[in-house]
Structures are given as structure tokens and as C-alpha cells.
Amino acid sequence: MLARGLPLRSALVKACPPILSTVGEGWGHHRVGTGEGAGISTKTPRPYSEIPSPGDNGWLNLYQFWREKGSQRIHFRHIENFQKYGPIYREKLGNLESVYIIHPEDVAHLFKFEGSYPERYDIPPWLAYHRYYQKPIGVLFKKSGTWKKDRVVLNTEVMAPEAIKNFIPLLNPVSQDFVSLLHKRIKQQGSGKFVGDIKEDLFHFAFESITNVMFGERLGMLEETVNPEAQKFIDAVYKMFHTSVPLLNVPPELYRLFRTKTWRDHVAAWDTIFNKAEKYTEIFYQDLRRKTEFRNYPGILYCLLKSEKMLLEDVKANITEMLAGGVDTTSMTLQWHLYEMARSLNVQEMLREEVLNARRQAEGDISKMLQMVPLLKASIKETLRLHPISVTLQRYPESDLVLQDYLIPAKTLVQVAIYAMGRDPAFFSSPDKFDPTRWLSEDKDLIHFRNLGFGWGVRQCVGRRIAELEMTLFLIHILENFKVEMQHIGDVDTIFNLILTPDKPIFLVFRPFNQDPPQA
């Protein structure tokens, strides 16, 4: 935990003196001009075995990792290792060996070698569950041609600009209802403001949003009484993420052999996710079959079924993955965004001014407004820089490549340390400052291969456009209706629970500009 009031960089520097180097210091001198590629050299590359490493005994490394309780601070470990070994290092934990890189030019070079069917690291307990219990898989786990076939279909329905336009009338009312929910809380507290930790409310908001987009129907997650079956799904997703971390470095064949409580809880969480997703999909599937006309966009499920480009089993698998991936990830990013806005009131006022100007110029047309808030969209990128959902981005290069003058064999797991990159002054000036304007710079070198919060390329997050729209609409309505402040001034640290989460509750203060919620 960081010392109260001590900025992240200061705390890290005190703990590990020059962990974060400046340009021209330490390994910062390795940087080359954009376009050359930091890992490209005319010299004969050095062998893979010479890449700096803490040692080749994976089990000893893993023992030390566990002894230091490193699993929940792995993102800080990356920073420490880059300072110790330079801009590239390899590490073996148990049976898993990875090469870690941080330089944006190395990242750009890596992606040139990802091939037509990019491969990411499969989270072992997730994959083990699907294999052991013979669950259908979607684009999260599919490879090669089967992945590409599904992904092309999904891109049309969830990533294309025309598809995104259909989501606006589904997502906008959910954000408006969240504003109404906060007004109810204000009246309940009776102090003219609401003070509290809204983490659970954000989970409900995210699930209400993703299910509305998937099925074209509301579940009522923002009502006074929450659907208990839907709450079970949310709780299961939370448990699935939190039980994943202790299992990451355990050989999957040991899961069923020892049947630890962590594995049993993990299985139970996935069982609930599949059972509830199957139930929702089947209910809405039968409902859609009975309808012949739709006044409004009927949701992604209907469009996938109508296109007949994907088998029903594949539709269900991909819907399940998008539902599971659309709760904790989006809600956590919004919580971090509110936290950063509450600590940077001048930035919050800049964002509010942009939103209010957009409202006036667009005459209330929300679709037009969305085209007029570049700073707000940049603020989401800035939140993901400081608080990325995933601490690394992974690829298995299709062929041999050279990074930092080292030869990386094909199919080596290469991990881009995006948390460490986002906190390094070699790549971001004043890295601990919440400054969305950095993403609007005309100097593209300043942001080249740095915006990696949703991944990159054809294998980026399939729900990216939904999440971006959902968060933008949410923030528009929050900024129009409330001033957001911290209840107590102080830093909140992050812990790794497969996604980065706060180490303590974040208590926010919502001060309404009007005592009554706006009329939808």
C-alpha cells in the first residue's frame, strides 16, 4: 500500500531508487526515432539465452515469487524488473517462460510479426475449465481459421460504425437511469449530496448495459430491487476473476487432482456464468423467434441469428464470453475514471465544459454530441493508461524477430508491459498526472503505440466499441448532473486480481447541480 498522500512514482522511487528512468537515463538511451524500430539493428543479433533474466530455474523463481506475495503486485514487479534488467528481459515462472518488453517501438515491431491469426496467452484455469467440462468456446479461445471466421462475423455486428449507431438508443437510457439512481441515493441520505462507494452500482450498470445491447431488453438492474438471478451472474464473474490469480502458475493437470477450494470455487463461478448466460440466451432466443417485426434495434443476439453466419452453439459461446467480459472490466474502468476526476477537479471542469458545449451545439442530439467530445474520449484513454484492465498484452510471433538486438524465436510468448509503460516518464511526461490532453497532441510520436488499453489490431478486445460508447455516455450524464469529489484526499493503490482493482473502497461525493433528476 502506498503511503498516505504519497504519489505512486515517489513511493516506487523510495522503494527501488531509480525504478522509473527519464529519457537519456538508464536504459532510456535505447530509444530510436519513430519508424526505425527500437529492436531493429544491423548487428548480428545476440542469442535468446543472453536476454537478461533472473534465472532459468522456473520453479525456484516461482517459489520466490510466491514467498514475496508477488501475485497481487505483479504490475509493480514488472517496473522493478525493467529497471534492473533494461528494456527487455525474460522470466520463467514454473513452466511458463515469457519475454517482457516496454518500448513502444519494440511493440510496433512485435505486431508486424503477429501473423494473420494473432495468438494471445490463454489464461490456464479458464482454458482448463472449458476443456475439462467440454464447454463451447468463442473468439476468446479459438485459434486460426475458426477464430477468424467467428471474428469477422462479430466485427460486423459489434465493431462496425453502423452497428455502433444502433447501440446508442439502448445504452443512453441506462446512463440516464444511473443518474436517477444517484438522485434517489441523495434523497435517502438527506444531506443534499451522496457519499459512498458505488462499485456495486457500477457492476449493475455495466451488466444492465451489456445485456441490453446483447438482447435488446432491460433486466432492471438499476431498480430498487435487483433481480437475484442477475446478481448471481455478477457475483460469479467477480469470483471467476479473483480465483484465477492463485491458479495462474499451477500446472492445469493438478487442478482436478488436488481439487483445492480455489479450483472448486473457480469451477462453480464458471458453472454459474454458463448456466445464467444459457438461460438468458434461450429465453430471449425463444422470444425473438415469436416476433416478426421490431420497432427498435433488437440486439446483437437477434442479428447474429438472423445472419445465419454462425452456428447456434457458436452464437451462445460468444454471447457468454461477451457477457462475462462486459461487467468487471467496464465497471472498474469507470470507477478509476471517477476517482481520477475527483482528484483532478480542474480536469473535471474542462471535461464538463466540453460536454455542456457539445449539448448546446448538438441541440440535445446525443449522436451528434458523441462526435463533439474528443477530450472526454481522450480521458478514457488516459484512465486506461494509468489503470489498464490487463497489465500486459501478449503475442506469440509467427516467425523469428529481433528485439533490442536479441533474437526472439517464433512462438515465444512476448508480453508488452502496458502498466509499466504507462507509468514511465520515458514514454509519458509527468506520468502520474491525469492529463487527457496528452492524447490530443499533434505530435503523433508522443502517442505512437501507447494506446493499448483495449489491445491492438485484429485481435483487440471484441467489445471495445461497446465499452467506449457505454463509458462515454455514462460520463456525459455524470458530468452534466454532478460534481464528483473524493470524500478523503489520498492515494488508492492497485492490486492484481487478473484485472487491476483498488486495494480499498473508493468513497466518492456526488454533488448534484439540480436536486431533481433530469427528465429523459
Show which residues each predicted segment covers.
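Cytochrome P450 heme-thiolate monooxygenase catalytic core
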Residues: Y121-L127, R131, K165-L334, M350
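Cytochrome P450 heme-binding "Cys pocket" and the immediately downstream C-terminal segment
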Residues: L345-V347, L440, I447, R465-T501, ...
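N-terminal mitochondrial targeting presequence
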Residues: M1-R46
